[in-house]
Amino acid sequence: MRIIFWGTPEYSIPSLDIFIKSKHEVIAVVSQPDKKRSRGNKLIASPVKSIAEKESIKIYTPKKIRGNIDFINELKSLSCDLFIVIAYGKILPKEILEIPKFGCWNAHASLLPRWRGAAPIQWSLIKGDEFTGVGIMKMNEELDTGDLLLEEKIKIDNDDNLNTLTKKLSILSAKLFLNAISILEENIYKNTNSCLLYTSPSPRDRQKSRMPSSA
């Protein structure tokens, strides 16, 4: 598979690393622009960009993606099979979602539809959830509502905190991405059209599981 990887923070690194070491080809990385994060206003690259530079992978750090015709045309020219998206930091518009042959896949760190949206790991800890997990979904224009391709549940240990649980889920995301692609490739070989293992949550389920107000 020819893959373009979208990610920014440390959380994205296990997934990028597993694809770099896999049989798949990471033809480019898209990350957030460098930010001023230290004294002297020095620009610091994102963790994902830093890894891509070390691996000599083509890097894009657009300030704007929606309506960015030059960037969109550049992505189209790369003839990509799949976009892998994990903690990139922006919602991808329709004109980008439609570019890759097999769509855009995202890893979400909760058992959807619970904790759809921002900060799912934090909410699972705040609310004392016994279990959490990762879902791999095919992205659409809405937030965390795409078809669910693969999901795995894990127990939240009593001594888990934000750091330990974040690390567990980032590693699990990487594993599930590869598993989902293996299913896709198997179905391509069998001439079937989809690797769906689950269906999207119903509107009623989504209504029940909206993120609580921070007030």
Located regions from the model:
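One-carbon transfer enzymes
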Residues: 1-200, 204
